[in-house]
Amino acid sequence: MPLELTQSRVQKIWVPVDHRPSLPRSCGPKLTNSPTVIVMVGLPARGKTYISKKLTRYLNWIGVPTKVFNVGEYRREAVKQYSSYNFFRPDNEEAMRVRKQCALAALRDVKSYLTKEGGQIAVFDATNTTRERRHMILHFAKENDFKAFFIESVCDDPTVVASNIMEVKISSPDYKDCNSAEAMDDFMKRINCYEASYQPLDPDKCDRDLSFIKVIDVGRRFLVNRVQDHIQSRIVYYLMNIHVQPRTIYLCRHGENEYNVQGKIGGDSGLSSRGKKFANALSKFVEEQNLKDLRVWTSQLKSTIQTAEALRLPYEQWKALNEIDAGVCEELTYEEIRDTYPEEYALREQDKYYYRYPTGESYQDLVQRLEPVIMELERQENVLVICHQAVLRCLLAYFLDKSAEEMPYLKCPLHTVLKLTPVAYGCRVESIYLNVESVSTHRERSEAVKIQHFASVVRPSSYTELDFLSVESAKQDAKKGPNPLMRRNSVTPLASPEPTKKPRINSFEEHVASTSAALPSCLPPEVPTQLPGQPLLGKACLRTVCHIFSKFSPY
């Protein structure tokens, strides 16, 4: 008699963490891509404004529209004359009312920025030390369908706090008529006023359902709680890579190479005689700086490697530091590009940041490729980066907080070292020319681009309504994003896998001729290689090629 299979009943065992049920991860705004309000939390002189400005610079650089709203500036606008720390006493009811009104005014501007001005992230930079204030901000975010992400900076090291006060606070407008000792004393008393009512974020009880990161002792430790989305995870990743230790970053281009002399773009040519002189001059410059544990980074192209070889120091090659891929325009001069690819030339002049070379890259692509380099630069101390013009522009735009519109036109001359020293809320730049002559590869922004002339050469029927594009309209287009005329090359990866040589095909006739030559015995007799009376173009060419390969494909 066959045995009957039986299955025991599954029992569920519930182990509650506490008496209050946890909120689901999906609670909050209904839209996945809702704008985000980043809420700073912490006592004064804990680096909140430093984090706000640095994070905003990074987010804008990667293409996420972000703006800081500093409540202290609203307070200084409302109260023209700062008297003393008494303004921040918790028992000063009139001052408390003014401070709350300033916070509400800042939140109104946050709402306007995120709903009307195209912003994606607003950084609400204030102390926000009480739960009452944070609940008010949470209610504001929920009411407007915004996500809220808190960043709390905690630091109990008196040396760090005193350093922050001396470097930043005593030079603020509040203390313009005070000496350093008076300013330090008043600010310490201001901190004491906040400490009396400070309620830190509590991940175990009161604030367990909030999304936040707690930065402890200037990045020594981190506590992350309930990250909601991709952008918040990128913010966490960025904050975990930055540090405040003194260091110097040196940026320079390779020495002049043979293609620079010939006016060609891209390629992988070696140094010219003047380029080799620069490499030797750079070696002497580095020795004079007497830097401890200097790291040297180069691209994988000859010119940067040959420049680094002269330093007689260990160096690392980064593929991410390779020059922008010019696709079919590699190893051409700008005059040759204008004559061979007139439409591409016009489109690039029209919008240099978003324009992508056919089978190549755009500046926007390059920024995405360089993000890991930026993360590693933020982690390092003294570094020398030897790279290329477009790459240097992208790196410089990050450190100097330049917009996407300005980035492709930053001047980065050959044989010049840019010395970057991080300061309180930015970066100090020194340009050091090493006294070796070179050609100039900088091209100024065009005042106007005559699209109709160039486009009519290729597609006369498509652009009959276009006139001159002025600089002002180009600026507006850059703010809005990629131009609608842009050919996006969606089949091309953002970063080309290797800087390999690509065969250039100037016309469909050349393509068909090469295809016919490659397959002389494979063409079916019923398929013509050229339509009667005209060259094989467009869909006709596509149908022909598809027909050929469908007939002779083994699959």
UniProtKB/Swiss-Prot annotation:
InterPro entries: 6Pfruct_kin, 6Phosfructo_kin, His_Pase_superF_clade-1, His_PPase_superfam, P-loop_NTPase, PG/BPGM_mutase_AS. The keyword Transferase applies. GO terms for biological process: apoptotic process; fructose 2,6-bisphosphate metabolic process; fructose metabolic process; glial cell differentiation; glycolytic process; motor behavior; regulation of glycolytic process. The active site is at residues 125, 155, 254, 323. Beta-D-fructose 2,6-bisphosphate binds at residues 253, 260, 266, 334, 348, 352, 363, 389, 393. Keywords: ATP-binding, Hydrolase, Kinase, Multifunctional enzyme, Nucleotide-binding, Phosphoprotein, Transferase. GO terms for cellular component: cytosol; nucleoplasm. Pfam families: 6PF2K (PF01591), His_Phos_1 (PF00300). ATP binds at residues 42-50, 164-169, 345-348, 389-393, 425. Beta-D-fructose 6-phosphate binds at residues 75, 99, 127, 133, 169, 190, 194. Its EC number is 2.7.1.105, 3.1.3.46. It comes from the Eukaryota. Residues 246-555 are annotated as: Fructose-2,6-bisphosphatase. The modification Phosphoserine is found at residues 490, 496. PROSITE patterns: PG_MUTASE. The modification Phosphothreonine is found at residue 492. Residues 475-504 are annotated as: Disordered. The record marks 253, 260, 388 as: Transition state stabilizer. It catalyses: beta-D-fructose 2,6-bisphosphate + H2O = beta-D-fructose 6-phosphate + phosphate; beta-D-fructose 6-phosphate + ATP = beta-D-fructose 2,6-bisphosphate + ADP + H(+). Residues 1-245 are annotated as: 6-phosphofructo-2-kinase. In the C-terminal section; belongs to the phosphoglycerate mutase family. Homodimer. Forms a heterodimer with PFKFB2. Catalyzes both the synthesis and degradation of fructose 2,6-bisphosphate. This is 6-phosphofructo-2-kinase/fructose-2,6-bisphosphatase 3. It comes from Rattus norvegicus (Rat).
